[in-house]
Amino acid sequence: MKKWMLWVLLIGLANVAFASQQWNDFSENVTPQNVHVFAKDLGGIIGSGTYTTGRILGWGGFQIGPRGSIVFKMSQGQGADEATRNHTALGDRDEVGAVFYPWLQADIGLPFRIDGFIRAGSYEGMTIAGGGLRWGITRPSETLGALQPMLVVAAHSASARDFSATHYNASLVLSMKFKYFVPYIGGGVDYTTLHINGADHYTEMEGTNDYATTARGTLGFNFKLPSYMDLSLAAHYAHYGLGGEASLTVRF
């Protein structure tokens, strides 16, 4: 177990060390035509991965591990021509390509069918920290085929060189227990306030806010592994289209 946690730490440090600071391209590329869709995309990225089943940990449970989300392509902005629409707040849509963000999350089981969680990450020039609560609508059941509904609420703060953001989301999750895996489906809403600190070509945008609300749906599978480990793989759909998320956690 100690070796596994050491490898996670080393991989995380390597990612930070060799990252390309992608989020620092914001001030060079943000425009009135792409800022709103960027706020929507950012909300979808931050809000993903807050759950991996519809089942709570239960009183005294604890879980920790790395998680990550990927957006395969950022949303198009507004504009009269294709080149303008493809110019995102991080650069040309095709050149930017997939956007990945990792973080470390810790969860703890509390009384009254409530779990609390905190998570944080710093990658490619953006730092995110936040947390939330999960509430099991029904009592946890070990019966195969049992449905487990859950409500999730979360809040985050994000900071980069040229922008900052606050983010709130709420989701409803439903999972079904099988012997070796747990499929889950969820839907939620992300609300993001984007504050612009720097805009090289549109200085009038500096100091202004953009407000964005977007829906997000998730479909995934959670697998119970040996040594109290869980592997979760999921696809989600938000304003930017298709994305993915994964986690590898250990339960105590």
Regions inferred by a protein language model and the residue ranges of each:
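Short loop/turn motifs that connect adjacent beta-strands in outer-membrane beta-barrel proteins
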Residues: T53-G60, T138-Q148, K179-F181, L225-Y228
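Hydrophobic, lipid-facing positions within transmembrane beta-strands of outer-membrane proteins
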Residues: G60-F62, F100-L104, T127-W135, P149, ...
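Predominantly the C-terminal beta-signal and adjacent terminal strand-loop region
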Residues: S20-V30, Y211-T213, K224-F252
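Solvent-exposed loop/turn segments connecting transmembrane beta-strands
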Residues: E95-Y101, F117-G131, A158-T166, Y211, ...
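Transmembrane beta-strand segments that form the barrel wall of outer-membrane beta-barrel proteins
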Residues: A106, L110-E124, A146-S157, L174, ...
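Transmembrane beta-barrel domains of Gram-negative outer membranes and organellar outer membranes
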Residues: S20-S141
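Residues on the lipid-exposed face of transmembrane beta-strands in outer-membrane beta-barrel proteins
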Residues: T53-R55, P66, L104-L110, G131-W135, ...
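Outer-membrane beta-barrel translocator/channel fold
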Residues: L151-N222
